[in-house]
UniProtKB/Swiss-Prot annotation:
Descriptive protein name: N-(5'-phosphoribosyl)anthranilate isomerase
Alphabetized UniProt keyword annotations: Amino-acid biosynthesis, Aromatic amino acid biosynthesis, Isomerase, Tryptophan biosynthesis
Pathway named in the protein's UniProt entry: Amino-acid biosynthesis; L-tryptophan biosynthesis; L-tryptophan from chorismate: step 3/5
ATP-binding is among the record's keywords: no
InterPro entries reported in the protein's UniProt record: Aldolase_TIM, PRAI_dom, RibuloseP-bd_barrel, TrpF_fam
Keyword Calcium recorded: no
Length: 218
C-alpha cells in the first residue's frame, strides 16, 4: 500500500518526508489552510527527494495552469478535488501526460458507482463536507467502499473496480491500522492526522507511515 502525505508548505516539512520516504506528497493549490503558490511549490519540489512523487491538488482549476506546472515538472501527478466532470478530465488529458487522481467526496454507494466510470487513473475517496472540498479531517466511512465492492462485483461496474484508489479522510496512525482487511486500497492519504498546530509533526509522520506499512504486511 502506497502512502501520501498531503499539504506540505515548508522546507522543514520537506526534510521530514525526505527522512521517512512516503511514496507521494501533495502540494495544495486551493482553499486556505494549506494553500501554496507555484513559486513555493517549485522551491519545495527542488528539495524533495527524487524517490518521492509530487501531486498537485486542485479545485476547479484552469487546465492551462495545471498544464504549466506539469510542464515545469513541479508536479508529477494531478489530483482533482472539485467538481471536475468527464469532459474536463478528457480535456485535461489532452494537455498533460501526468496521471490523474479524481477525488470522490462520497456519502453513498450510489455516488461512488456514478464516479467509477470517470476517465481518471486513480480515485481518492474522501469524506463529504458541506462547507469545503476537503474532508476537514473527518473520518471517511469505509463501509461505503466495502458495500460498493461487494455489490458491484458481478454487475456492469465490475471492470471499473480494478482502478487503483486511495483512502483519505481523518486517517491517523491509530486508525489506519484498523482499515477493513477486505479492502485493497492502492494507497492512503493523510494531512491533518500527521499535524500539530497546523504543521507536519515528525513523530506523527513516522508513526503513520510505519502503521500503514504494517497494515500492508497483514
Amino acid at each position: 500500500m502506497k502512502t501520501k502525505i498531503c499539504g506540505l508548505k515548508s522546507l522543514r516539512e520537506i526534510e521530514i518526508v525526505n527522512k521517512y520516504a512516503p511514496n507521494y506528497v501533495g502540494f495544495v493549490f486551493a482553499g486556505v489552510k494549506r494553500k501554496i503558490d507555484e513559486e513555493v511549490a517549485s522551491l519545495l519540489r527542488r528539495e524533495l527527494s527524487s524517490e518521492i512523487q509530487a501531486v498537485g491538488v486542485f479545485v476547479n482549476e484552469s487546465i492551462e495552469r495545471i498544464a504549466k506546472m506539469c510542464e515545469k515538472n513541479t508536479i508529477q501527478l494531478v489530483q482533482l478535488h472539485g467538481d471536475e466532470d468527464r469532459d474536463y478530465i478528457n480535456a485535461l488529458k489532452l494537455e498533460v501526460g501526468a496521471p490523474i487522481i479524481k477525488a470522490v467526496r462520497a456519502q453513498s454507494v450510489e455516488q461512488i458507482l456514478e464516479a467509477l466510470t470517470l476517465p481518471c487513473d486513480y480515485f481518492l475517496y474522501d469524506t463529504y463536507s458541506e462547507h469545503s472540498y476537503g474532508g476537514e479531517g473527518k473520518r471517511f466511512d469505509e463501509t461505503i467502499l466495502t458495500e460498493v465492492y461487494k455489490e458491484s462485483s458481478n454487475n456492469e461496474f465490475k471492470k471499473y473496480l480494478q482502478k487503483p484508489y486511495f483512502i483519505a479522510g481523518g486517517l491517523t496512525a491509530q486508525n489506519v491500522r484498523l482499515l477493513d482487511s477486505r479492502l485493497e486500497p492502492y494507497g492512503v492519504d493523510v494531512s491533518s492526522g500527521v499535524e500539530s498546530m497546523g504543521q507536519k509533526d515528525e513523530e506523527k509522520v513516522k508513526e503513520f507511515l510505519f502503521a500503514a506499512w504494517r497494515w500492508n504486511e497483514n
